[in-house]
């Protein structure tokens, strides 16, 4: 590294207070550049700051006559003398005189180094004077402006930072000045432009790869951007270059402690850090001290970490025993370790060193509170309160006030207000601080956990019931804990307390997830096992509850002394019906030390107060089990004991409420209400008592007016945002949203920044169907700066109202912001992107929808990466959301026929949520569409294994069995569903289709009978009529089919399909091959007769009328409608109409890849227009496509038409292959049998021809006379005269005038029978 690089390194280490580093770099500079006195000066300065004043004096004396450093050396000599306990006044006077003389004659360099030295010792204003003088001299260097910028920036204020950035930019115009680049980084950091700062650091690393502070900066900036992975990578890279790098070791230790929660690895890194400090900064007491702060506050009072930290502090104190702040910190360490006597000693030592040390006094008050010296603590706190305004608010002193108020049994609301002030004051010091070492120190999770514990002591110990509003105290706890877990996800105590908050909030699922996460990292956490037992108990999982209690006891035998342990055990025994055992367990709990005030020793006083709510719960549970055991007298006796025991305490009203609950359980609502009415506004449980009364009025007496009166009384007597919120929620409970809006607005007036209230008002307006007002309200709320979550609600409403463009604008506005790192903000963005995709889908912009979903997927990947550490309770829901996003992308891909992509995303969805039956079903269906039967069967079987009653999966399994030609199994699966529910018409319609494809339509009628027997009104059901129509259509009875479909056509569920089927029947009642030529002239002149022509035209007009009734809601539905409209045009057989249809089909085929109905339409049009080669090309294209159930009918028609073309060309083998394919997928396909018969007849294989015509005659239900004619003719040729005569009679019975059959076949068959 060159001279300038080394000097920048020295400046950096001076500012960071790494004085041994200064010494080492200066030594290196002296070796490389022995003629440069600057390095000798900083060697002396480093020596001085390490406490070796005499050695430093000698070094400064040796260089005080060197021109460039003479002025700063004289200043340094004065500084040394002034630092001395007994300063030499004469020497100082003499040096001052010399310095003034030197200053008059000093050149640019001398002034620059003097300014630099003054900056390093914190004399900013004096330094500026020297730099200003220097700037007035002629120069061609940027040194002065760059140092001036550094002076501005180290003031740490935004306006100065702006000006400093300008100076640094000017300083960089002539090249990459490393000192200016470092300054620019700091400027951007102060302005919170961490990405920009990181870019600049990268610039330093590229140009100066051996400049290690750049890597340290990079590491800290990556942490500020909350990218722990990159931070760790940079730290490890640093250690490869310098294995004693203090910052890298500190960062890795913090990573293992805060992020991973791996205490052993963190302790190892701390050990390495201590060794590195001994080598690199052995005399730096301040560094030893400052390094401990973040660790002691984030380790969750882990003894291993605290012992390491203590050794650092003891080293620091041994180096500077006069430092009161280090003694104070040692006192705090003793508190954290539970060594109160040791803490007293260190706090008193600190007071001796500095009588005005506020932190030491605060520590002493804390000791007094722990020891129960309430009067002394009260006096001290009173004294501090008098001058707290002048010294600024202290969160810790407020907290001690709150603790004292709790111990003195002050009103709950007073304690809550104090704790609220503590939190607000504490978090005000964190504003604008990025994630980093200072943030961890200021956040002080340990302190916040103490505050949360105090909050929780004020909460009801019973979880909130369903629909019960969340307690503001619990909401506050949740907010504080979210902040801790977001920053220090490796802290098990925070995760445990979050689980407790979730449990008390009634969210047992979230509590369970948090506890699982907590116990994975800390399996011996006894209290977590205890809470897990409570969670299991609330979920009625009694065996698991018992297992958790056993685990708890195995990890900590002392839990037998916890009343809570016995309480949970008794409750689980009660649930198992072991009431007598529960009574024994509770009596054991009643005999525990501290359970009764009269028995409580001073030693157990603190713990008794903390567990007061659990003590009361033991009493109340004992009342309950005695009552259940029929021991009413004993129950009443225990309740009286509870009244006596808790009289005058903050728990007294819980006894009253429990007494009311007991009366209520006995059906005495009057007595319950009488007790609750006695609770006054001044008492702590007033709101809870009123809520209980309201509940009685609503649920037991069904008196809505008295119910709402209770909440009105709360709002009148205690007018607060919470009271009006409760009133609003109460109005919503009784379906009075207009009144609810008024109450919510009153709450919002008192708390205008509460986004939750704004959302409630919006939702209430939507509930009143006042949509326009709701939109106006949301828009106004957003303009006034309400939370961005309102954007989502507004967009959702606009989507619901089909105002797609407005919804798109709202969502785009909500997403148009700088990149965010807050987890909650990322979640909002993810949800907004998914909603935007829904909007795009409705606007028929599938590519934009997929793009939005891809954005959501990327966001969700980031969320999942962080949520496991920061919000473990949210992991299942976030994984489910990630699966939904992937499934949506898969659906869009499948719609665009990109099946491979669809399968990839469905698989990804199952990685997130492997048990999601809906996604598994969709993937199985997709595999089926891809003809991958084994993969489809595998997923379907797995799904049915988990849920054997899953209807769609059973239907899919039936499809699969059909594809595998296992028809009996296919029918069996659908029969299973119908046996369970005979009137399941969706399944019945599918079964009819399946029996048709199996060639067993004769089995259908019995299922109609089953449905009719199941419900006498079945015949009136549109689904039943639809299924009947389907059966008649498939059995060659088009008129009956139309009649039944007509009865279903107005139904919302069945109507659209019924209409499509009716249109198809109108266009092709006899199920002919439209466009086919083989059978075109078989019926002679019947096809061209006026009656036939008129009948066709009438049918087309009917189809056109029916088309107008179709109202498709999807893109595919609208496409299907277009296809049908053009099929109507083709049915007219008029050239212009057919050509018009052909153009439309061609357009669709061009825009929709492999669209079978459009390709079939084109082929049919070409056949009608007598352009057979073009038709054949399209049909051959279709023939290469795999079969799928959705397009089965069109595929069948395509194969039949292509077979017709091949037969016309006498390519019978190719035709047979296609016809066999038709029969493979539909054994009732009359037309396929008819064509096969025709081929056999042409080949004079009359027996085979007769067999195929026989199948065609059977499956057309003997209704088609043309098929009957051909069958009789081939019987005649095969010499089966009796069969030929029977068929002739069947045809003539239905069609007496059918031409030629009598003369050509009947008479000849009879003649052949005569001897």
From Swiss-Prot:
GO terms for biological process: Bergmann glial cell differentiation; cerebellar Purkinje cell differentiation; cerebellum development; cilium assembly; forebrain development; forebrain dorsal/ventral pattern formation; intraciliary retrograde transport; negative regulation of eating behavior. Component of the IFT complex A (IFT-A) complex. IFT-A complex is divided into a core subcomplex composed of IFT122:IFT140:WDR19 which is associated with TULP3 and a peripheral subcomplex composed of IFT43:WDR35:TTC21B. Interacts directy with WDR35 and TTC21B. Interacts with TTC25. Keywords: Cell projection, Cilium, Cytoplasm, Cytoskeleton, Repeat, TPR repeat. The keyword Nucleus does not apply. InterPro entries: ARM_TT21_2nd, ARM_TT21_4th, ARM_TT21_5th, ARM_TT21_C, ARM_TT21_N, TPR-like_helical_dom_sf, TPR_rpt, TTC21A/TTC21B. GO terms for molecular function: chromatin binding. This is Tetratricopeptide repeat protein 21B. Pfam families: ARM_TT21, ARM_TT21_2nd, ARM_TT21_4th, ARM_TT21_5th, ARM_TT21_C, ARM_TT21_N, TPR_8. The lineage of its organism: Eukaryota, Metazoa, Chordata, Craniata, Vertebrata. Component of the IFT complex A (IFT-A), a complex required for retrograde ciliary transport and entry into cilia of G protein-coupled receptors (GPCRs). Essential for retrograde trafficking of IFT-1, IFT-B and GPCRs. Negatively modulates the SHH signal transduction. GO terms for cellular component: cilium; cytoplasm; cytoskeleton; intraciliary transport particle A. It comes from Mus musculus (Mouse). Belongs to the TTC21 family. TPR repeats lie at residues 108-141, 145-178, 192-225, 285-323, 324-357, 492-525, 563-596, 616-649, 721-754, 756-788, 790-821, 830-863, 883-916, 918-950, 951-984, 1022-1055, 1196-1229, 1231-1263, 1265-1298. It is found in: Cytoplasm, Cytoskeleton, Cilium axoneme.
